[in-house]
């Protein structure tokens, strides 16, 4: 089934000018179509004005009137560590007060705090926390994430974290690829 969003007050687009992606200053070139329309099924098939959309064959197309609404691309977060346990909020307060990361780590804090909490947590506990964070990201406009491990610091815990990353729901699994290690680096 295809859907046509039409009469969009502000349709925000990315002007890639035919490029597969854009970076740097080119990212400031944001387009806007007023009174826009967008046709999509599994992928975006057409973007233009609501007036131009009247030329589209709407047989078997669900039409949604978006009068007064803004439509924009979703955010992409390509580096998350959503599978974790514990909190280091108290360390943030110390950092704001002037403590260095090295000082906090020397006292057993830093990543070691998270490592211990992750190792002690069950897969179900880690999954519940990751699910909560993933749903929050989705509610705030992030449509694609990559979930990385990294807090286990040993093979067994890293594998546990990667398994949890594949359990979370809310995105299709192609949008939540686990990334076990940097390509070319040896696994231990």
Where are these regions (language model features)?
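Solvent-exposed loop/turn tips at the surfaces of repeat/solenoid architectures
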Residues: 7-8, 42
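Histidine-rich, glycine-flanked metal-binding segment
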Residues: 14-71
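Alpha-helical scaffold segments that flank or form the walls of functional sites
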Residues: 39, 69-71, 88-147, 163-170
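Active-site beta-loop-alpha junctions enriched in small/polar residues
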Residues: 81, 150-152, 181-187
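Divalent-metal (often Zn2+) His-rich catalytic cores of metallo-beta-lactamase-fold enzymes
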Residues: 147-161
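Histidine/acidic residue-rich metal-binding segments in metalloenzymes
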Residues: 157-178
């Amino acid at each position: 089934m295809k859907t046509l969003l039409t009469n969009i007050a502000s349709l925000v687009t990315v002007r890639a000018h035919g490029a597969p992606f854009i970076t740097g200053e080119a990212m400031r070139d944001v387009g806007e179509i007023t009174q826009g329309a967008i046709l999509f099924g599994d992928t975006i098939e057409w973007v233009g004005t609501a007036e131009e959309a009247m030329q589209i064959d709407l047989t078997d197309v669900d039409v949604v009137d978006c009068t007064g609404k803004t439509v924009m691309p979703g955010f992409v977060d390509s580096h998350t560590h959503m599978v974790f346990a514990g909190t280091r909020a108290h360390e943030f307060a110390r950092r704001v007060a002037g403590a260095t990361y090295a000082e906090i780590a020397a006292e057993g804090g830093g990543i070691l705090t998270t490592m211990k909490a992750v190792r002690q947590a069950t897969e179900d506990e880690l999954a519940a926390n990751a699910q909560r964070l993933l749903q929050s990201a989705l509610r705030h406009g992030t449509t694609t994430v990559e979930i990385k491990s990294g807090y286990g610091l040993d093979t067994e815990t890293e594998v546990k974290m990667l398994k949890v990353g594949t359990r979370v729901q809310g995105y299709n699994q192609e949008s939540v690829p686990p990334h076990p290690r940097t390509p070319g680096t040896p696994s231990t």
